[in-house]
Amino acid sequence: ARIPLSSLNPEIERITAGKPHLYVLNKSDLADPEITRQWLAYFKSAGAGCIAMDSKQRGRATATKGLIEKELSALMERRRSRGMVGAAIRVMIVGIPNVGKSTFINSFAGTTRAKAANKPGVTRGKQWISVDSFDLMDMPGVLWKKFDSLETASNLAFIGSIRDDILDIEELACGLLSSVRGIYPQQLLARYKLDAEALTLPPYDLLQAIGAKRGMLISGGEVDTERAAKMLVGEFRASKWGRLSLERPPRRAIQEDREEVTDDAPQDDDWDDEQ
């Protein structure tokens, strides 16, 4: 829910073009509620099914069952007309790493059915999980080969969808400070007990100031910036700064993007045979 646009995988959009979609803004408990409402309105105005939730709340994902059936109403009607009553509805749960897909499935099922953890790469292979009249496919998180912008790559790294061990943690922390101080300055000031002038510092100097405030010093009184960076990124991901959203809805409608993708993609006129 904190980066709805950056987390939208264009390859998945291309592959699934023409098929029913339901966008789940998961981990909404970490996002700015007002911005999340704007995103819901944005998707709704484009005619796209969308729901915001915190899948850690047991049973919360069951609210999506009715929405899934709504998105698949045409398919279900075709099945009924062909006498295919009682056939399971197949749903693919797909998204980038570390957005709570397995947690969503466990909430949907009302019990632990998929292994989940707050880090990328926990789900290693696809598996089918049956829940009532639904067959859910749990899949590993998928990133695409080339990001369209540095902002997209940075946002994915900020929330932990890219493994930290391949990143420069200090550079990541400085990028996060640059992004957040312009949209949520008061949260930074309050969390790290800074004065307003600190926000005018270059990002690395601001990181040092935060490390000094937390007493993260090494011999000679210098700030341990690596330790400070790990702390800062970890606290952001754990929502210790408050409920923050890094993206606002863009002006162009999502429907325009999906229509462009659909024009280039092969159509599946008999989707119900597979789904």
Over which residues does each language-model region extend?
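Canonical P-loop GTPase G-domain recognition
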Residues: 19-22, 28-94, 215-217
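Helix-rich effector regions associated with P-loop NTPase G domains
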Residues: 1-21, 28, 34, 48-49, ...
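Short coil/loop residues immediately preceding or within conserved phosphate-binding loops
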Residues: 86-88, 111, 126
